[in-house]
Amino acid sequence: MDIFDKIEKLQQSNEYFYIDYLPEKCMGDRFYEFEEYYFSNNLNSFCGKVSNIVITLLAYYDAAGVMTEFPDGYTGDYKKLYDESVDIAKQDFEYISDLIRFVLTNEFSSMQFLIGKDRDMLFSINNRNSIEIINANSEHIDLIQKLVMQEGLYLRKYIEE
């Protein structure tokens, strides 16, 4: 099974954790106004926090990673990472941090990391509101929880409504 097939299979799960900037689900009338305010004032900081979490996980665990498709017409430098199926988990940490900032700022493409000895946990950065951890064991969750708390973010379990 190639890396894209494994990622697709893991993404079919509806049991996962996600990283959020809010401690609880916000149902207030002004949520979208708050979200716009939060990211217009904190996007750089948020990108740095997510980068710190990912890079620390890559320091702890073996991993493989890929970028996903780019929109039609995108011709920037990062497109070759997808076109050539480059293992982004093996790039230097500064470059990985730049990629995370790119994905979270532009909100297109995504980064998918298979983490662990058997590469059975998926850390998926899809956009600002979709940073998911799928098929993580208790050891992974314990570490991720500590890293997320250290960065002032929240690890929440997805509950289907």
List each language-model region with its residue ranges:
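Structured alpha/beta or helical-core interaction and ligand-binding surfaces enriched in interleaved
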Residues: 1-130, 134-161
